[in-house]
Design a protein with these regions (language model features):
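N-terminal secretory signal peptides that target proteins for export/translocation
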Residues: 1-12
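Bacterial N-terminal signal peptides
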Residues: 16-26
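Residue-identity detector for glycine
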Residues: 7-8, 29, 49-50
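An N-terminal assembly and electron-transfer interface module characteristic of large anaerobic redox
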Residues: 20, 32-454
Length: 454
């Protein structure tokens, strides 16, 4: 398939503003805070203090967590396990979720909390409310130095807490809750040690390990019963957020969908933190060398194109755009609009700038209530029909890549309406010459071009 794009100085402002706009828009499916490698944490910063007030005798530590929907499963699951192991009366966790508050606002009153853990969360008036709570004695810990500078301690200046949060995983999040209890001198609670969790790799639900690269993965996968050497290979590229938040059941659905369609999947997870370039070279070749096509819910960020550009050129396969929305599946299916306007930039525009094609909504965030804690959280839920459709499209692209150029059939469509400003010629495009150049290039690549342009 051929696509002609054109532009000029009138579009230059869009390219300059796009990186800024992407940072300001909500970003479904990924997180700005990333997992840190397992290493000895640095000593605490001199400005890193502890709790401002002592816990009331006989009362639990009251913790408010300010967050977004994608992080709620691990926070709730870990709290459930904490209560199971330590009982009630040690810690109370109250989640303030950006998307949930937007639908059902509640007064921003935080003075009753002993500690506020400020993660990524944007609620109007939140900063002022947190600052007021700090003046009343609440201990505010923020994962970013871009917010709450006047009242918060930076999480990374508290290595005993950061070691748990930055590495994620259910065990580490339980450990974070335990370490908070230690900070408030809760009797009977001793924090477990943090355990390293991979922040990049290849996942399969039937494997006992996360693979570092495709070479080791395919060596394992090809030894499985029923492996078809001639089946198409489909790469699935995702952010690491869901893996770090223990939502691997969603990964399993993605993998099984490809396997049920008769293809061989390889799912790789990874993430580039906003404003950083940590992590070295792009993992695309390491994960997906030899695949026929890639399905990706990555590339929401403009800086990712620069990071992956060389690897994409070397990989030289179609990359289909998978979209995860921060809305419930039923809400999306009942909407006449489909994709909300504030999702277009990071879900459609930015991925297309990176070369992704065929955007398809494949998942939403489903509100669920934990029966043990009574807390609401948001699971990533696959939209089955749409995902099956995208898998079929991916396999069609794989088949096309395996078809000789002379046997492919291509239609070139162009818009040309009346004369004047509406006409393509008024945009200073020489349509005839462009088509001739395209057809000549196709012929040079082995396509069978018949006839001539009149």
């Amino acid at each position: 398939m051929c696509r002609i794009r054109h532009g000029g100085e009138r579009f230059a402002w869009l390219a300059r503003l796009l990186p800024i706009a992407v940072l300001l828009m909500p970003h479904p499916g990924w997180s700005q805070d990333s997992a840190a490698p397992a290493e000895t944490p640095p000593e605490a910063s001199p400005r890193a203090g502890g709790p401002k007030r002592r816990r009331s005798p006989g009362k639990p530590v009251r913790l408010a967590v300010l967050t977004v929907a994608v992080h709620t499963p691990i926070l709730v699951r870990a709290y459930d396990r904490f209560r199971e192991q330590h009982g009630d009366g040690k810690l109370e966790v109250d989640l303030w979720v950006e998307q949930q508050w937007a639908e059902s606002p509640r007064p921003l009153e935080f003075g009753q909390y002993d500690m506020i853990l400020a993660l990524r969360c944007s609620i109007p008036g939140l900063a002022a409310a947190v600052s007021a709570a700090a003046e009343q004695g609440a201990w505010v810990v923020s994962q970013s130095d871009m917010q709450y500078r006047d009242c918060a301690v930076l999480l990374d200046d508290l290595p005993d807490l950061a070691a748990y949060y930055r590495q994620r995983g259910a065990d580490n999040m339980v450990g974070l809750y335990e370490k908070i209890c230690e900070r408030f001198e809760v009797p009977g609670v001793t924090a477990r040690l943090p355990v390293p969790v991979a922040d990049a790799g290849i996942y399969h639900p039937d494997a006992s390990e996360v693979f570092a690269d495709g070479q080791h993965y395919w060596k394992w996968y090809q030894g499985r019963p029923g492996y078809d050497h001639d089946a198409p290979k489909v790469g699935i590229f995702v952010y690491n957020t869901l893996y770090l938040n223990d939502e691997t059941d969603y990964f399993t659905q993605l993998i099984r969908g490809v396997e049920q369609a008769g293809a061989s999947p390889v799912l790789g997870f990874w993430f580039v933190p906003v404003g950083q370039n940590r992590g070295g070279a792009s993992p695309l070749k390491r994960f997906f060398d030899g695949v026929d096509v890639v399905i990706s819910s990555s590339f929401r960020l403009t800086n990712e194109k620069l990071h992956h550009e060389e690897a994409l050129l070397e990989l030289d396969v179609p990359v289909l755009n998978s979209i995860i929305l921060n809305v419930a599946r039923e809400e999306w299916s009942g909407s006449r609009q489909g994709i909300p306007a504030n999702y277009l930039l990071n879900s459609i525009v930015s991925p297309e700038f990176s070369g992704l094609i065929e955007p398809t909504v494949i998942a939403g965030r489903q509100p669920v209530t934990n029966p043990n804690t009574g807390q609401d959280y948001f699971r990533t839920v696959l939209i089955d029909d749409n995902y099956r459709w995208q898998v079929r499209r991916a396999l069609a692209w794989a088949t096309l890549r395996r078809t000789a150029a002379a046997d492919r059939r291509i239609a070139i469509l162009y818009y040309n309406h009346s004369g004047g400003k509406q006409n393509i010629g008024a945009s200073y495009l020489n349509v005839t010459a462009s088509l001739e150049a395209i057809l000549a290039d196709l012929a040079a690549r082995g396509y069978r071009v018949e006839g001539a342009i009149d």
